[in-house]
Regions:
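Active-site gating loops and adjacent loop-to-helix segments of metal-dependent hydrolytic enzymes
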Residues: 83-125, 168
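Charged catalytic cores and adjacent phosphate/nucleic-acid-binding surfaces used
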Residues: 1-8, 12-30, 34-36, 47-90, ...
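Alpha-helix-centered segments that form part of catalytic cores
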Residues: 111-147
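Conserved acidic
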Residues: 39
Length: 246
């Protein structure tokens, strides 16, 4: 096994709330400077910048993970991670059919830029990505897993779109992993919700600016002699709740 410092929740300039400097190449470069080994790109309800992100990360020696931050019909944010680009693209096609056809207003919400790995703009998503998709939390998780991925509630320690803030509880009969935005909140949430003690905990940044990307603090111990194998190991740990790191 090898140790990989990670950040599994990063937004690019495709997310309207993401800074325009959050290009795939800039994210990969900053993650490399910080010493991260695995980084997931998780834009709101879209994975269209993941191909450019893969190319940029591979140049920097980082293992990229294709992902999405899905907004469910309950208005809960769900991190969805995939073993490869094709799985993420298929999942996105399913989600795109469930997104409301509301046009983005860049002057209000921000631009939604689709990039190549050289920081070139190749397009712009016209429909607003922030709105909830017509898919429930449970169905979103199941759909993600049907494409070989893993899904878990994002930033449960935040008021905005966190599962606890929205639903009033962390469902006790589920086998979700869960994400914290602040590692120092772990004890508080374990005390409030004892049933999460045996679930896989993930600490990630939800970065919308380059300086928000995680420092090399949280890590997984993962198997694999290739990027594909390491991604499969990561998803297996998340799905099965293994205590993979800290």
């Amino acid at each position: 096994m090898s140790r990989y410092f990670y950040d599994l929740h990063v937004h690019s300039c495709l997310s309207p709330c993401g800074d325009d400097d959050m290009t795939p190449a800039n994210i990969a470069g900053m993650a490399s400077l910080k010493g991260l080994g695995i980084v997931a790109l998780t834009d709101h309800n879209s994975a269209k910048n993941c191909p450019a992100f893969f190319t940029a990360c591979e140049r920097c020696g980082i293992i990229p993970v294709a992902g999405m931050e899905l907004t469910t019909s309950e208005d809960v944010h769900l991190v969805c991670l995939f073993p490869d680009l094709s799985s993420a693209a298929e999942f996105e096609r399913e989600i795109a059919r469930r997104r409301p056809p509301v046009r983005n207003r860049p002057e209000i919400f921000g631009r939604q830029l689709i990039m190549d790995a050289e920081d070139g703009i190749t397009g712009e998503e016209e429909n607003l990505l922030l709105n909830a998709a017509d898919i429930t939390l449970e169905c979103g998780k199941a759909l993600c897993e049907s494409f070989g991925g893993a899904a878990y509630p994002a930033h449960i320690d935040r008021e905005s779109n966190g599962i606890i803030a929205v639903l009033g509880d962390f469902p006790p009969d589920t086998h979700y992993a869960y994400e914290l935005a602040d590692k120092d909140s772990a004890e508080e949430y374990a005390a409030r919700f004892p049933h999460i003690a045996n679930l896989q905990k993930i600490v990630s940044s939800d970065a919308h600016y380059l300086w928000n990307i995680s420092e090399p603090e949280s890590f997984f111990e993962l198997e694999g002699d290739s990027a594909d194998a390491v991604r499969r190991s990561l998803i297996s740990h998340i799905l099965h709740g293994a205590e993979a790191g800290r």
